[in-house]
Amino acid sequence: KDFIGWLWTLKVKVGHSVRTIKDIEKITKSDLKEFTSYLSYRIIFCKKNKLPSLNSDLDKVSNKWNKDKFFNAKKLEQNNRFKSFDSTEFNLEPDLKESPGCLRDFQTALWILEHCFKIKKLEDCIKLNLFTREEIVSVNKSYAHIKGLRYILNLYSNSNRLSFENQLLLAKKSKLKSSKKSSAVEKFMRVFF
């Protein structure tokens, strides 16, 4: 409670909940977003002897969403998100969290790999011949780049949107310089896309 209060004081928005396993089972049975949130949960405080039991209980909750149902629901969710961000406005000023190719797509892929294939780390995909090492390196580099941009943007703006103003800001923070051929913002957005 004190930790969350401290974060709020710092104006950090953080998703959080305090729930029993029974609460989690009830909520996640029919709510995809709630279920997905438990695929990437982070424990702030837990007694060591309770952790194996917690993981076992969460595995039971996980079994309520079969692989096909989960995959199809995530695909539908992604298609709906793509439709809502399919406009000239969002093509010119993408949202670092929700626009196609941004954080939510990386997260969706990770959630599908974890739930449907029991893969905890991208590197495990190499052992299963799902991806090459080069592909994993490229994905990790892109994911880190988008997360880094969002982090910097969130330090200066209360938005995930790469508005023209924010593009200028991030181009400047990236120390890009304009040239005769292209402006710093054009260079920044070329790297982004």
Feature annotation, model-predicted:
Residues 56, 64-193:
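Conserved nucleotidyltransferase catalytic core and NTase-mimicking acidic/glycine-rich helix/loop elements
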Residues 2-49, 148:
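Conserved catalytic core of two-metal-ion nucleotidyltransferases
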Residues 43-64:
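Long, acidic, intrinsically disordered low-complexity segments
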